């Protein structure tokens, strides 16, 4: 009988150990290098007004972000939906980008709920019946200043004075600095030539802005960045005051 009991114990022990082994956390050093180097971004901004490159695109809005990055490469999804006004712009953008040193390049697929497709279908890519706008950008960070250039190359782009595709472009210079416990960013943006996409008849400064951000610490491990921004569009002679906050784990 004693020999039989020993045999039963020997048979049961491996099965008793299995749940315990299943609960063990994976050793980070044993993970493949690819998995360890991938970074994930999950965040959401809530803003009092949606101002983009000097254009008023809506009132109070929720703007979520989901992205992954790996060794300079990144793929990000970004969206915007109005909270106070259902008719505000709905937007869903996908951006693939690469940064090496101080140089960055990228391509963005913008989708708006207004365009050439009256049914506002996302998977509608026909040249003359889509709400998508495809944009390429290149930029360089000089340290004190960062310069970016953006050009639409396909989709629902604007037209120039002659009614032809404008290849609408926008360039922006930004200068980050720190002052009085806040992180500040000053920016000046301009449209270099005529396009209906930005509602310009030629070269025009469309964005002059100053933004301040400060973290409000909630716990030792969690803080909420609060930001305020003054933005003006000399072309349209309009000015905006925006406040918002970011939620990010």
Give the label of every model feature segment:
Residues 46-50, 70-72, 79-83, 100-102, ...:
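Transmembrane beta-strands of outer-membrane beta-barrel pores
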Residues 124-195:
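Detector for outer-membrane/organellar transmembrane beta-barrel domains
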Residues 24-39, 106, 177-185, 213-226:
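Short loop/turn motifs that connect adjacent beta-strands in outer-membrane beta-barrel proteins
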Residues 36-40, 58-62, 88-92, 101, ...:
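Residues that define the transmembrane beta-barrel architecture of outer-membrane proteins
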Residues 23-83:
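Short glycine/proline- and aromatic-enriched beta-strand/turn motifs that initiate or cap beta-hairpins
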Residues 42-44, 66, 75-77, 96, ...:
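Membrane-embedded beta-strand positions of outer-membrane beta-barrel proteins
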Residues 1-39:
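Cleavable N-terminal export/targeting peptides
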Residues 24-26, 210, 237-249:
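Outer-membrane beta-barrel "beta-signal"
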């Amino acid at each position: 009988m004693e020999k039989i009991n020993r045999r039963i114990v020997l048979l049961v022990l491996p099965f008793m150990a299995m749940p315990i082994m299943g609960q063990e956390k994976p050793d980070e050093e044993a993970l493949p290098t690819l998995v360890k180097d991938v970074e994930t971004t999950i965040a959401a901004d809530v803003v009092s007004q949606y101002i983009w490159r000097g254009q008023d695109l809506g009132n109070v809005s929720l703007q979520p972000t989901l992205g992954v990055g790996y060794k300079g490469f990144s793929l990000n999804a970004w969206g915007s939906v109005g909270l106070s006004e259902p008719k505000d712009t709905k937007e869903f953008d996908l951006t693939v980008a690469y940064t090496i040193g101080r140089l960055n390049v990228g391509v963005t697929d913008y989708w708006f709920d207004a365009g050439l497709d009256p049914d506002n279908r996302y998977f509608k890519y026909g040249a003359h019946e889509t709400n998508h706008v495809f944009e390429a950008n290149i930029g360089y960070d000089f340290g004190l200043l960062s310069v970016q250039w953006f050009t639409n190359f396909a989709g629902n782009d604007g037209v120039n004075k002659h009614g032809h595709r404008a290849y609408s472009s926008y360039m922006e210079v930004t200068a980050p600095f720190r002052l009085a416990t806040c992180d500040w960013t000053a920016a000046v943006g301009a449209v270099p030539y005529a396009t209906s996409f930005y509602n310009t008849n030629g070269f025009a400064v469309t964005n002059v802005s100053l933004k301040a951000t400060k973290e409000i610490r909630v716990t030792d491990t969690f803080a909420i960045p609060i930001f305020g921004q003054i933005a003006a569009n000399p072309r349209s002679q309009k000015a905006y005051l925006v406040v918002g906050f970011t939620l990010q784990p």
